[in-house]
């Protein structure tokens, strides 16, 4: 379920999913962009009604947006629900391409800022703002210290936690894909994690 449905009761949605699973059309179901409350309510509904439950949740999670760790991670660990993080490099921001020019000509958020819909523009400024740029500078320095690409660092962070099943990555060029795949051989140790946490404390919630 791509977004929480604010109109249809969660029980009704889960019963519909349950039928699909019983018919063999779907193996497992997952949700996306939900809150700790929403995921907990859905999970309790599945238990009480003895119907299929969400096995995964797909949410925005990255060095620039670690909010999942506040509450949702606890739900996932206790209920054994896996996170599939998307935007692990913050929509490309963590690559550093927005540091020299706020909106490069060939970048996604440059197009967003020119969009006539204010909501689309707001999405761009959520990803690219003074705080995300400041945090990115620190992560670029940290990646350089460890001799890796900032993209590799970002993807490695997104898959570091035990409640993460897999990380959703995207690339337009082969070299971009290589930087992401390198993260699967790079392990974040305790010392590096402490440095990351220091940056996160210094610049709280860059994406709001």
Where do the language-model regions lie?
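Beta/alpha (TIM)-barrel catalytic core signal, keyed to glycine-rich beta->alpha loops juxtaposed to Asp/Glu
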Residues: 4-5, 9-198, 207
């Amino acid at each position: 379920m791509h977004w929480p449905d604010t109109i249809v009761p969660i029980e009704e949605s889960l019963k519909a999913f349950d039928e699909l699973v019983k018919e063999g059309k779907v193996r497992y179901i997952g949700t996306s962009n939900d809150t700790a409350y929403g995921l907990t309510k859905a999970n309790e509904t599945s238990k009480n009604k003895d119907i299929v439950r969400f096995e995964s949740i797909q949410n925005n999670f990255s060095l620039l947006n670690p909010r999942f760790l506040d509450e949702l991670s606890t739900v996932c660990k206790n209920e054994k629900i896996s996170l599939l993080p998307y935007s692990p490099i913050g929509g490309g921001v963590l690559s550093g391409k927005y540091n020299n020019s706020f909106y490069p000509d060939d970048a996604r958020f440059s197009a967003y800022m020119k969009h006539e819909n204010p909501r689309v523009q707001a999405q761009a400024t959520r990803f690219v703002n003074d705080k995300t740029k400041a945090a990115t500078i620190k992560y670029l320095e940290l990646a350089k210290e460890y001799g890796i690409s900032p993209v590799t660092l970002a993807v490695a962070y997104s898959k570091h936690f035990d409640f993460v099943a897999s990380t959703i990555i995207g690339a337009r060029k082969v070299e971009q894909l290589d930087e992401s795949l390198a993260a699967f051989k790079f392990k974040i140790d305790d010392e590096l994690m402490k440095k990351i946490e220091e940056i996160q404390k210094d610049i709280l919630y860059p994406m709001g």
